[in-house]
Amino acid sequence: MITSALATTVVARTALARTVTAAAAVAPADPVAARSQMGFSLGWHIIVACLGVGMPALVLFVEWRGQRTGDVYYRLLARRWARALGVLFAVGAVSGTIVSFELGVLWSGLMDHYGAVIGLPFTIEGFAFFIEAIFLGIYLYGWDRLSPRAHLLSGVPVVIAGILSAAFVVSANAWLNSPQGYTVRGGRLVGVDPWSAILNPATGPEATHMLLSAFMVTGFLMASVYAVAMLRGRRDRYHQLPSRLPDTMLADL
């Protein structure tokens, strides 16, 4: 069974390579420039994307602690971090749109041949993005307008949608490393199973790595901001409290 599975994987990867090679006519004229542009765009987007995944959970946790303990500093931090989250979400939406356009323009051969296989995760990611945007708007607008409990609950879909959005996008990248969910006959794709493509062997490790990295990036960045402030002499509770919260998140991870 193991030998058969390995053989199937090798055949699938060989078929992928052949089809991509056959699509060379629509490949970028300068692959090095195309790769450089894609790498630069992704390098910028991934930083904002990590914050977009990890920061909602941190903001929601701080607000929950504020409601539970009655500490006004928690509420103040949650409100200010939420504003920063709104800006980061807008920047991430723009940078993510650029990456998606580059994927279709620079590597149109891949998408033309395999769009039916890996199109579903991008579609689901789009739905998750809109859900995240809608509830983030409610969350930001709902300060002092919704009850504390309703406002806290309005942030839950933001956290869930952000995690799902990242996981489904990563599954498309994982499929490139472990392609499955289709059969090539006569140079054409038949028997396409998008869910099999999404749930390929590389999706679990890559998605786990991505999500943990997102929370770690968020924790380290938030802790460093207030650590710098404390080094400059601001050692009041407002600066001490947030410097400990990200450390707690990192310790849990």
Predicted regions and their residues:
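Polytopic transmembrane helical bundles with strong interfacial aromatic enrichment
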Residues: 2-5, 10-253
